[in-house]
UniProtKB/Swiss-Prot annotation:
NCBIfam families per record: PRK00099.1-1
GO molecular function: large ribosomal subunit rRNA binding; structural constituent of ribosome
InterPro entries linked to this entry: Ribosomal_uL10 (IPR001790), Ribosomal_uL10-like_sf (IPR043141), Ribosomal_uL10_bac (IPR022973), Ribosomal_uL10_bac_type (IPR047865), Ribosomal_uL10_CS_bac (IPR002363)
HAMAP family: Ribosomal_uL10
Family: Belongs to the universal ribosomal protein uL10 family.
Function field: Forms part of the ribosomal stalk, playing a central role in the interaction of the ribosome with GTP-bound translation factors.
Quaternary state and interactors: Part of the ribosomal stalk of the 50S ribosomal subunit. The N-terminus interacts with L11 and the large rRNA to form the base of the stalk. The C-terminus forms an elongated spine to which L12 dimers bind in a sequential fashion forming a multimeric L10(L12)X complex.
Full protein name: Large ribosomal subunit protein uL10
GO term, biological process aspect, one: translation
Signal peptide interval: none
GO CC annotation: large ribosomal subunit
Protein's gene: rplJ
UniProt KW keywords: Ribonucleoprotein, Ribosomal protein, RNA-binding, rRNA-binding
Length: 182
């Protein structure tokens, strides 16, 4: 038995809400995956702020129809589709999917759409991999913090070196005067 019009409306609103929070959507072909495998994929994606939605292409088509940023996704809506809606860590989500794909060997990435404001860009698997290879937000923050810390450390050493140099110079002059006096 099919879903009622009301339940489809609820699903459609959930999809629209999820899409509005996502910055990237990856579309995968999930044919052949078991419920346990899909649950495993969801578990791997959860720490990256990504949700996996399995829904009919027609419902996803209706959900993206009102948002021009997701329009490029229309070309990916065919066959059995699962949608990986990435809210936070794009690189981490792609790596988690790649790890799952390597384990299951049953899924295929059709592509993705990166939403930038009101525009969306269709991405191939190679382009998604290039994005995933970029450092994560946490790694960039750590690199910047490390650079700032290094500058502060060098500055502190330089400031401490001035009095130490002065003390060594005074000591050298005092020793010189002692030698001359003796």
């Amino acid at each position: 038995m099919g879903r009622s019009r009301e339940s489809k409306g609820v699903i459609l609103e959930e999809l629209k809400t999820s899409l509005s929070e996502a910055q990237l959507t990856m579309v995968i072909d999930y044919q052949g995956l078991t419920v346990a495998e899909i649950s495993n994929l969801r578990r791997k994606l959860r720490p990256t702020g990504t949700i996996c939605k399995v829904t009919k292409n027609t419902l996803m088509g209706l959900a993206i129809a009102e948002d021009s940023g997701w329009e490029p996704m229309k070309s990916l809506l065919s066959g059995t589709s699962a949608f990986l809606l990435v809210k936070e860590d794009i690189g981490g989500a792609f790596k988690a999917y790649q790890e799952f794909k390597k384990e299951s060997k049953k899924t295929e990435l059709r592509g993705g759409v990166l939403k930038e404001g009101t525009k969306g860009q269709l991405l191939t698997e190679e382009q998604l991999k290039a994005i995933a290879d970029l450092p994560s937000k946490e790694q960039l923050i750590a690199q910047v913090a490390g650079a700032i810390n290094a500058i502060a450390t060098k500055l502190a050493r330089s400031i401490n070196e001035v009095p130490a140099s002065l003390a060594r110079a005074v000591d050298a002059v005092a020793r010189q005067e002692e030698k001359e006096a003796a």
